[in-house]
Curated annotation (Swiss-Prot):
Sequence similarity: Belongs to the synembryn family.
Native organism: Danio rerio
Principal place of residence: cytoplasm
UniProt KW keywords: Chaperone, Cytoplasm, Guanine-nucleotide releasing factor
Protein name listed in UniProt: Chaperone Ric-8A
Length: 548
């Protein structure tokens, strides 16, 4: 039906005529996501008429048709102005059942109308800053929080719950003030933890130990249903928004208890599966992202459950969750695409867990850096997890290579000699330079004094290992053998002049280790002086060796 014809029907004010026209339009445009240019004014006019209808006492079918039309029209960013006003948002919020003190909510709400209004709000809030501001002013988050509290009430179906959560995610992602309101005023972490609890159907055998109700003691849980998985992922995304800065600030005792309670539920998330591998990985990804936001001391809940039959035990501690996190990290590492977005959350989480929890660090070290036996290959060669991580230490992305190096450095208890042993000096140089550790030593850290037991193979090969490459190298002939002192000096100065030229042309920048252990630039005269000094020392050592 022509847009002008629909507008004419709406302008008559007749509810039946409007219903027929809108139902026809909605059917024709149900899959329309791009709109004809030049009709913006007509679409805006239709939007205004539909909103005016929604202010009247309409039969449910007409309400639903009006909201469906708004949902379709709100896909067009160029025709949003009728819907982004405070008054329009008020109308839609009321139809979504989220209004604050505006009339009585019916005893039996029309769920179809509520869901359609929520879909409209999602589109409009996503596409319009003015609508976001209006939503904040109208206390939309308060209405959403009130309904989130009813997470165990049977009257709300999946669609209402899901779009409540989707709208909450959007408004907290787009408005910092609403995010803060949910986090603090509305006690968002507790509220959303309860929603997670209800969605999973959890029971609590102990204070920070979680089980699925009806499956307590089962070694393998059934996959979470599709609808429950969708809601869980929305909740995890909202929690990520509201906890974004929590790992960077001090939390009091009450907050720590709240985060530990959430952490216990997140442990259950990471140990659960969804219907299909792709869905499971997506749920685990959101869980890992959120775990990275939790205050570090609260991550101890990952290790709290009792060791049961079939559990991975290490030093008397249940390592099931840590094992799953390592497997998740390695899967992302093997995939190799978008490493910064996909790998770093899990790698950072494991790094910080290892830094603060001795049992986790020792378990991870046993998995990633087992006693060294392979001394013939470079540390970056091979398919072991250590080899894969060492390869990342020279990755083109600075964040990726830094995180990989930091993880291995922490597993080495921030000992420079141990770090070089497992990675080779050439791979380790970047992190050591950044930390001011080029002269060796150890970063100050709180690590226990356990032994680094060397294998027989490593002890035998150690004197022959090239510290730069991290492997035993075949003996190479001395290229200066047979040269006179004058020839050696000539070759040395030739090399210095080549470096000098490259430096002046800013192709390279010669560096030296400063007094603080960090790298600093070398001036050309320093390079010449160093070469002369080294050559002089070489001559002296040759003279000494010739003396009887």
């Amino acid at each position: 039906m022509d847009l002008n014809a629909i507008i004419e029907k709406m302008e008559t004010g007749d509810q039946d005529a409007a219903l027929t026209a809108l139902q026809t339009y909605n059917k024709e445009k149900s899959q329309c996501f791009s709109f004809t240019s030049g009709e913006e004014e007509d679409r805006e006019r239709l939007g205004e008429l539909v909103l005016s209808f929604l202010e009247r006492d309409l039969q449910p079918s007409c309400q639903l048709a009006c909201l469906e039309t708004i949902r379709i029209l709100s896909r067009d960013k160029k025709s949003l102005s009728p819907f982004a006003t405070r008054h329009a948002m008020q109308i839609l919020i009321r139809h979504a059942g989220l209004g604050q003190g505006e009339g009585v909510t019916p005893e039996i709400p029309d769920l179809e109308v509520i869901v359609e209004a929520l879909k409209c709000l999602c589109n409009i809030v996503f596409n319009s800053e003015a609508a976001q501001e209006a939503a904040a002013d109208l206390q939309l988050m308060v209405g959403l929080a009130e309904r989130l509290k009813q997470c165990r009430e049977p009257q709300w179906n999946h669609d209402v719950r899901f779009f409540d959560l989707r709208l909450t995610f959007l408004i907290t992602a787009l408005r910092v003030d609403v995010r803060a309101q949910l986090a603090h005023e509305l006690r968002g972490v507790s509220l959303l933890s309860e929603a997670l609890d209800a969605t999973f159907g959890l029971c609590w055998p102990d204070m920070y130990e979680v089980a699925r109700a009806g499956f307590d003691g089962c070694s393998e849980l059934p996959p979470l249903g599709r609808q429950e998985t969708e809601r869980v992922m929305e909740i995890l995304k909202i929690l990520f928004n509201v906890t974004f800065d929590s790992n960077r600030r001090h939390v009091d005792e009450e907050e720590a208890a709240t985060y530990r309670h959430l952490g216990a539920i997140l442990r259950h998330c990471i140990m659960s599966s969804a219907e299909g591998e792709e869905r499971t990985e997506e749920m685990h990804s959101h869980t890992v992202n959120l775990l990275g936001n939790l205050p570090l001391p609260c991550l101890d809940v990952l290790l709290m459950p009792k060791v049961q039959q079939g559990s991975i035990e290490y030093m008397g501690v249940n390592m099931d969750a840590v094992k799953v996190l390592v497997e998740f990290m390695e899967k992302r590492l093997d995939r190799g695409n978008k490493l910064k977005e996909t790998l770093l959350p899990s790698l950072n989480l494991l790094t910080e867990s290892a830094r603060i929890h001795r049992e986790t660090r020792k378990f991870l070290r046993n998995k990633v850096l087992p006693p060294l036996r392979d001394v013939k290959n470079r540390p970056e060669v091979g398919n072991a997890l250590r080899n894969k991580l060492v390869r990342l230490m020279t990755h083109i992305d600075t964040d990726v290579k830094h995180c990989a190096a930091e993880f291995l450095f922490v597993l080495c208890k921030e000992s420079v000699s141990r770090f070089i042993k497992y990675t080779g000096y050439g791979n380790a140089a970047g992190l050591l330079a950044a930390r001011g550790l080029m002269r060796g030593g150890r970063d100050p850290g709180h690590y226990s004094e356990d032994e680094d037991s060397d294998t027989e193979e490593y002890r035998e090969a150690k004197p022959h290992i090239n510290p730069v490459t991290g492997r035993v190298e075949e003996e190479q002939p001395n290229p200066m053998e047979g040269m006179t002192d004058e020839q050696k000096e000539y070759e040395a100065m030739k090399l210095v002049n080549m470096f000098d030229k490259l430096s002046r042309e800013q192709v390279i920048q010669p560096m030296k280790i400063g007094a603080d252990g960090k790298m600093t630039s070398m001036e050309p005269h320093e390079l010449h002086h160093l070469a002369s000094q080294q050559f002089g020392e070489s001559n002296n050592s040759d003279s000494d060796s010739d003396t009887n």
